[in-house]
Amino acid sequence: MTVVTRDKSKIAAGLFLALSTLSTFAAHADQLADIKKAGVVKVATFDSNPPFGSVDAKSHDIVGYDVDFAKALAKTLGVKLQLVPTNPANRIPLLQSGKADLIVADITITPERAKVIDFSVPYFVTGQQFLVPAGSPDKLDAYATARIGAVKGTTGEQELHHRFPQSRVLSYDDIPLALSALRNGNVQAITQDSTILAGLLDGAPDKAKYKVLPELLSKEEIGVGVKKGEASLLKVVNDELLNLEKNGQAVSIYNVWFGPQTKSPQPRLFKIEAK
């Protein structure tokens, strides 16, 4: 009798574990259905990184390149859009904790990040550059031992440690704080995506005192971040991004924020393509 009871206990425990595992998997793997049921998609995006995402001075709404893509994704999902303001260091934690369903916040696709979240096809291609005082050297290697400012949690921060191990990298919560450090002389250069630096410099009252170095620190592809294993949601995101390219809306969004008439004009040298 004792043996039978023990066996029954083992079977019961095994069934409980199996059911728990299935329940957890179902809850994890059905985020698309959860979003549609809730009627809202929560998207982590920047609120201080123009032209990708920043607060409009007149409307006080968050606007930008990323925001327009977030709006398009919400529309194809058939739900309302809830923007969740973030900074580079908080993007992935917000997604993993469930406080955001998607990351549309200028997040670079890297092998390290791909271990913990999934990425869509790239919807933007950029590169890291340096912003320095106008009289500074033009070559990146001249800053090999310099004090360089970067934004926490960005690929630029990581690349600096790899490319210039002798430099002193100072990390900041966002790019405006890094610019303040450059103005104050706390750093000799700051690095960020080329498009963000162009927008930052254009809006600076003292922009004549600074310049963006032409040489790229790195070339980077930007994608939408999705929680690991959410294949159905990822497919919807990818399909919509490819559709936006096909119907010309992706180009229209690009021109609004990076076209010739904008504060940070950049030629569009990429297409959204399946990989």
Identify the function of each model-found stretch.
Residues 67, 82-93, 135, 152, ...:
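Short helix-initiation/N-cap motifs at beta->coil->alpha
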Residues 75-76, 84-85, 89-102, 116-118, ...:
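Short helices/loops that flank or line small-molecule/ion binding pockets
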